[in-house]
């Protein structure tokens, strides 16, 4: 394969030209968007901008700057004519001179640094004097202006004498007199400003050529420069340094015979001394060594080729300004010592403030002591800085731990706050439920009160009570009337007009929430009519548990019962609990207290008389006891008025909790008991009328008893006994009193037995014995007891009553202690007495069946 490129078509114009075949232009078809839509792949404006930025050239700014420079150069070439050869030579000479001066200045600065460092190591730093370097110039040549430097530190003492070059190289030629004068002026300027450099040989040659070509221009320039330098040297003459010791005046006159040299020496002589160089100048050179270099670099960067005279004058002015810097801004050694003392004093204050050990000031002499104190101060400062940094780190760690603890405490506080809010919400809900319960209870109490008030039967019973009171009054006024009021057996709860009403549905936990007695209505008008009608007791009374009895009742029962009994009727405890509850709900008064004491005493006496009652047989006289039905009806009425007392276990005044099951069973038997007991009450009234009816003076005794009983019952109907707290001493006194009353009751019963024996053995005598035990009233602290003697009835009527009602004996014995308000001589207030008429035909059976206190045991 050949790499030679050959013209395929041959030379132009030769041969046959080939015809160009025109391509057929194909018709552009329209884009079919139905196949694929490529607009989704089109770049967004942001993508286009990013791509442009990516593909831009990195050197764009540099190229732009270069292009601008080229354009500026073109304009400058067009505007400015070409520089002459003289200007080019002048610029080259100045560059050479200035470069040499700059290099020399750098070398001097480095040596100054080295000397200052060595001076700090040795206490006796070298003593140096000012030298005047003099350069012998070649004939017919002038020295170029150099940068003035006032630093004479590194200049060695070259000679003991000051020899001017003009004294050694004097020329008698008058033509060169101006040149010598100019050279002498230059040497004067050099002495004034302590010049320390010399020009190169090349510079001299160039200047000689320039002088030959342009002597007039150079002479004019140098005259201007000399005038400026002379004025500046006069201003800085006072700051000149002493020179070395000069030889004798004769030698001076011989060597320096020129007028310029004499004038300079006469000016410098008063200032000459043998003192050493000021150390502050040295320290200033060490501390401010770079200032002169910076100023010279600035001068170096400002070349001006358009005006050589301006260039030279600006260079000289910059050099003189640089020479003025050490004298004006350099601190002395004393100032530095004072400053380091201030630093040490501040460090001491800091040490006292922070509680550190204070270190004394160090007496520094010379630069060595200054350096030592400076280094020690720096070490102390660095140590304190390190300690403060460690303390700061510890504080940061402590702060982090405290922040963590604070976060934990905040979480705990938030949790406790949430718990408190939750408890507050629960408390609010509980209070709302309690308020709702109280409102519901109040509504139920109000509704129950209205229901009891609106019951029409109580008003009928009230009228019956009024009629009963009238009948008893009629018996008192008519002592010969044998009739006995048999309608005095209304239960205790329904005898008064001011009776406390108790709710049916909910009994409040606190007894103080029960409505007040003045708001209660007449209970006698709110009971159904069949309550006091004759009834038959179908079920015997249930034995209550001992937990339902109060502790006082248990003590009294154990004290009074001198013999064990097979069964104690529970209705007595029910009556006492009712009376105690009524006492807690009603206010305390003097009459109420008396009634309460009597009720307690007679209830216990009734118990003493009922210990052996269950052992009596059915063949006994049917009128064994009249108190059971009435008291049973009374307790049944009390239970019927509180049917919902034990829907919830409630705590009463004595702290006992009623049992729910027992109360539910009581609720079911309430109505049946009421009917049965009312029937028994009617039967007992009929039997009482039949027994007492035939006797004449019997009626007197019973009327008297009925009158006293009715009057006493009217007292108890008005108000109910209140609660009286019993102390152990009062309980013992009460027990002793009960025992005494029991003994008195035995005596009275013996008298009644004697009367019954007389009636049974002497049927021809009057039916009622004229011997009658008087009514006895005793008072102890406002208490009273009415005791009467009631003669028994004849045997035929007793047998008749027993045949008419064969179950009346059993029923009356079962319901003993329920209706004692009407005819009990032992307790006319609480309803717990017993009447046992004599039946001679059943004497033997009664002796076998009755208990320890049966009346038949006393019959002979």
Swiss-Prot record:
Q: Which residues form a coiled coil?
A: 383-437, 729-755
Q: Which GO terms describe its biological process?
A: cell division; metaphase chromosome alignment; mitotic spindle assembly; regulation of centriole replication
- Phosphoserine occurs at which residues? 646, 765, 769, 824
Region (Disordered) residue ranges read 160-200, 232-254, 293-330, 790-860
Q: What is its main location?
A: cytoplasm
Oligomeric form and interacting partners: Interacts with CEP120.
Q: What is this protein called?
A: Spindle and centriole-associated protein 1
């Amino acid at each position: 394969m050949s790499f030679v490129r050959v013209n395929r078509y041959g030379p132009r114009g030769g041969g046959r030209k080939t015809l160009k075949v025109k391509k057929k232009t194909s018709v552009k078809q329209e884009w079919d968007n139905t196949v694929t839509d490529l607009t989704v792949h089109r770049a967004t404006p942001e993508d286009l901008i990013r791509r442009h930025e990516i593909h831009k050239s990195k050197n764009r700014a540099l190229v732009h700057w270069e292009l601008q420079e080229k354009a500026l150069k073109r304009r400058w070439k067009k505007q400015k004519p070409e520089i002459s050869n003289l200007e080019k030579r002048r610029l080259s000479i100045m560059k050479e001179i200035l470069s040499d001066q700059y290099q020399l200045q750098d070398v001097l600065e480095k040596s100054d640094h080295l000397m200052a460092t060595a001076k700090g190591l040795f206490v006796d730093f070298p003593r140096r004097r000012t030298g005047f370097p003099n350069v012998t110039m070649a004939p017919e040549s002038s020295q170029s202006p150099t940068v003035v430097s006032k630093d004479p530190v590194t200049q060695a003492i070259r000679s003991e004498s000051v020899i001017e070059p003009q004294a050694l190289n004097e020329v008698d030629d008058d033509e060169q007199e101006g040149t010598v004068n100019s050279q002498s002026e230059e040497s004067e300027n050099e002495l004034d400003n302590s010049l320390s450099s010399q020009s190169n040989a090349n510079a001299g040659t160039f200047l000689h050529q320039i002088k030959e070509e342009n002597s007039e221009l150079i002479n004019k320039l140098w005259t201007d420069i000399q005038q400026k330098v002379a004025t500046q040297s006069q201003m800085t003459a006072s700051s000149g340094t002493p020179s070395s010791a000069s030889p004798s005046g004769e030698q001076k006159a011989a060597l320096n015979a020129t007028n310029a040299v004499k004038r300079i020496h006469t000016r410098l002589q008063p200032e000459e001394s043998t003192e050493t160089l000021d150390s502050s100048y040295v320290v200033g050179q060490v501390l401010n060594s770079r200032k002169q270099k910076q100023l010279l670099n600035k001068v170096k960067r400002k070349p001006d080729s358009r005006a050589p005279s301006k260039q030279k004058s600006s260079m000289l002015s910059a050099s003189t300004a640089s020479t003025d810097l050490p004298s004006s801004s350099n601190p002395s050694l004393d100032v530095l010592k004072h400053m380091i003392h201030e630093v040490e004093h501040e460090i001491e204050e800091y040490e006292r403030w922070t509680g550190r050990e204070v270190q004394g000031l160090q007496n520094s002499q010379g630069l060595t002591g200054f350096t030592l104190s400076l280094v020690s101060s720096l070490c102390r400062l660095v140590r304190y800085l390190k300690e403060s940094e460690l303390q700061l780190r510890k504080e940061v760690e402590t702060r982090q731990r405290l922040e963590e603890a604070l976060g934990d405490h905040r979480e705990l506080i938030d949790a406790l706050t949430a718990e408190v809010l939750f408890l507050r919400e629960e408390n609010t809900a509980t209070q709302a439920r309690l308020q709702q319960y109280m409102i519901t209870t109040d509504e139920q109490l109000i509704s129950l009160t209205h229901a009891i008030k609106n019951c029409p039967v109580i008003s009928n019973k009230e009228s019956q009570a009024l009629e009963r009171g009238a009948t008893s009054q009629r018996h008192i006024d008519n002592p010969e009337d044998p009739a006995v009021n048999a309608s005095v057996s209304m239960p205790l709860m329904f005898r008064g007009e001011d009776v406390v009403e108790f709710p049916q549905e909910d009994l409040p936990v606190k007894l103080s929430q029960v409505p007040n007695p003045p708001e209660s209505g007449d209970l006698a008008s709110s009971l159904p009519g069949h309550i006091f009608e004759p009834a038959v007791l179908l079920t015997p009374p249930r034995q209550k548990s001992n937990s339902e009895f109060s502790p006082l009742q248990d003590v009294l029962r154990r004290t009074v019962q001198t013999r064990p009994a097979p069964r104690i009727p529970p209705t007595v405890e029910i009556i006492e609990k009712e009376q105690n509850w009524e006492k807690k709900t009603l206010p305390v008064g003097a009459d109420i207290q008396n009634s309460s004491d009597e009720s307690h005493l007679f209830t216990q006496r009734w118990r003493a008389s009922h210990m052996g009652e269950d052992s009596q047989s059915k063949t006994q006289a049917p009128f064994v006891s009249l108190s059971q039905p009435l008291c049973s009806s009374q307790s049944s009425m009390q239970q019927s008025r509180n049917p919902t007392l034990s829907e919830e276990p409630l705590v009463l005044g004595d702290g006992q909790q009623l049992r729910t099951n027992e109360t539910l069973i009581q609720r079911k038997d309430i109505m049946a008991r009421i009917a049965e007991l009312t029937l028994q009450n009617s039967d007992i009234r009929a039997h009482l009328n039949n027994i007492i009816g035939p006797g004449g003076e019997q009626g007197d005794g019973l009327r008297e008893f009925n009158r006293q009983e009715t009057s006493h019952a009217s007292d108890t109907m008005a108000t109910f006994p209140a609660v009286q707290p019993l102390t152990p001493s009062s309980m013992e006194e009460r027990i002793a009193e009960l025992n005494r009353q029991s003994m008195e009751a035995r005596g009275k019963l013996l008298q009644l037995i004697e009367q019954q024996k007389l009636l049974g053995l002497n049927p021809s005598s009057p039916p009622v014995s004229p011997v009658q035990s008087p009514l006895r009233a005793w008072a102890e602290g406002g208490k009273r007891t009415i005791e009467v003697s009631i003669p028994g009835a004849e045997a035929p009527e007793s047998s008749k009553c027993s045949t008419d009602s064969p179950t009346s004996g059993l029923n009356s014995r079962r319901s003993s202690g329920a209706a004692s308000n009407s005819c009990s001589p032992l307790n006319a207030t609480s309803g717990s007495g017993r009447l046992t008429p004599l039946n001679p035909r059943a004497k033997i059976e009664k002796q076998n069946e009755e208990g320890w206190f049966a009346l038949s045991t006393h019959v002979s």
